[in-house]
Amino acid sequence: MKRLTVIVKGWPRLSETFVAQELVGLEALDLELDLWSLRHPTDTRRHALHLQLKARVRYLPEYLWQEPGRVARGIGAAFRLPGWRAAFAAFLRDWRRDPTPNRGRRFGQACVLAAEMDPATAHLYAHFIHTPGSVARYAAILRGLGWSASAHAKDIWTTPAWEKAEKLADMAWCTTCTAAGADHLNALVPGKTHLVYHGLDLSRWPAPAEARAPRDGTDAQDPVQIVSVGRLVAKKGYDDLIAALGRLDKNTAWRLVHIGGGPLKASLQAQAAAAGIADRIDWRGAQDQNHVRAALAAGDLFVLASRVAADGDRDGLPNVLMEAASQGLALVATDVAAIPEFVAEACGVLVPPGDPASLATALQSLIGDPTARARLGTAAQSRVQRDFPFARGREALYQLLHPCLSPPTPL
């Protein structure tokens, strides 16, 4: 079997555990991978999963001016490839509709990739159809290879329709991790996109060894532990969560543990201070998977207040919901994007997005009812175990990839 070249936007990324889980899982099925990243890492921590990847990891020039010699050699080599004329024509068509430095950078990166990728490469596979998809597409045309992609969330909802449609028509197949995303993409190019849930590798998420204490919010010395994990960006709705927490009964004992970094941290901390709840929130920043698992295991309740951002960005199906469910936590989340595909009535509470009052009502009710939390948490744990196993999604992806990498059967 030949090699698969995988293109990602950044590696490693703490917020994209689903990518690491998938690639390590594919290697376990004996696929030979080369990983190319458009960006260098910005996270100072890594998940254990990142260290388990055996593939070579290489970084394309993040900005073309940073490595002018390498870029010049890449363009020169790409110019001599049989696919140059077709690839450059595709780039020019895109440039006319998107004349941005970002578009030019992706073509330059594609030239470097096409020049430097392993000659044994049989197929290219991009995680996210926006910028990684552009690099994969141009490089595939240059080398005369097939390509495919996995679409997720922001890339689906913020990429122009013309670009998505042309990429889908050009690629062998696409996968996406939500039914909402699959419906949207298949409306553009029917039959090209497959629904493949990431699922959760439960061997990495064992259930907590000890039962939770029945905290009910009446003991200030032992408050109910609310946990939320997510980047501090608009689509995660943390301003709505803080507004909801500020509405809770002042005599209710609760504490929020938040894990994740992001550009809105200072404004959210100021909002919490203005609401008089700053001393109840533990902002832990970006953490590796071991710390996330420990926080979830120690928690009583998980909350995620996602919404659609002004630019159309939104969540897909956040993996952290499955991670919280694996730890037997009751879930409070918003009825937006693909969240309802996992959070059913029996295993959690859904509230309208952008509605702090409804969110506060749901939190107040569950903080004071440990029996309901236990019932919902048990149901959530059963749902992830039964309906979202990692092996199922990995096998579906393998069945798509394998024909792209295997030599044709002799007639």
Question: Where on the chain are the PLM-derived regions?
Answer:
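Carbohydrate-associated surface elements
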Residues: 180, 199
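Acidic anion/phosphate-binding donor-loop and adjacent secondary structure
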Residues: 160-163, 186, 200-218, 222
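Short hydrophobic beta-strand element within catalytic cores of glycosyltransferases
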Residues: 321, 326, 330-333, 343
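Short alpha-helical donor nucleotide-sugar binding micro-motif in glycosyltransferases
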Residues: 286-288, 294-299
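Acidic donor-binding loop of glycosyltransferase active sites
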Residues: 297-312, 329
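A conserved nucleotide-sugar
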Residues: 115, 220-232, 238, 242-283, ...
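A short, well-ordered alpha-helix in the C-terminal region of glycosyltransferases
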Residues: 280, 358, 365, 372-387, ...
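Conserved acidic donor-binding segment of nucleotide-sugar-dependent glycosyltransferases
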Residues: 345-356, 365-371
